[in-house]
Amino acid sequence: MKNKFIIFLSIFYLFFLNLYANTTPPFKNISVHEKPIQYNKIVFEDFDNQQIDLKNYNNEIYILNFWATWCAPCKKEMPSLDKLQQNKNIEIFAINLETKNEKKTKKFFKDLKIKNLSIFYDPDLKLVKLFNIRGVPTSVILNKDRKEIARIIGDIDFSNTDFINWLLNTTGNKQ
């Protein structure tokens, strides 16, 4: 009887240890919201001045990455963000906050060998105001209902296995 109790406690402990490990952000610059934040309209533009509205997408996870070509940390994290875009459950929108300059922006992507990401703009800085963006890089993580569940201020390695596992577990648990 005593052995069964010890086995039960061990399993119970391992279960909650695993649960905690999967919900704790792997990087200190990730801020997880206790309650998801709802936004009414998330709209930005592509190179062709076409409006992109998130309500027209159907994914499990959205990442809005706010960046600039002059930003060294943005340059550092962009290849890992490009790699993460290969995940079919994640839709990443790399939103350049500079004045629209197609030549400069495409060169930035070409120099970094970015192949999976598309480039978007926030020409009137409406999203900057909506999301209260204070600097770059900043990444806003939204769940399938397009509610903000977490925010990353500064650069991270988006291809880090611990981050990917945390991201998939967190977005699956937040409603």
Locations of regions flagged by a protein language model:
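Positively charged n-region of N-terminal signal peptides that target proteins for export
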Residues: 1-5
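Thiol/disulfide oxidoreductase modules built on the thioredoxin-like
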Residues: 110-115, 122-167
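Hydrophobic beta-strand anchors of alpha/beta hydrolase catalytic cores
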Residues: 63-64, 92, 139
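N-terminal "domain-start" segment that seeds a small globular fold
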Residues: 22-54
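Short active-site neighborhood of thiol/selenol oxidoreductases, capturing the structured segment around
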Residues: 53-75
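Short loop/turn microsegments at loop-to-beta-strand junctions
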Residues: 39-40, 62, 136-137
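Bacterial N-terminal signal peptides
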Residues: 8-17
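Structural microenvironment flanking redox-active thiols in thiol-disulfide oxidoreductases
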Residues: 75-112, 123-130
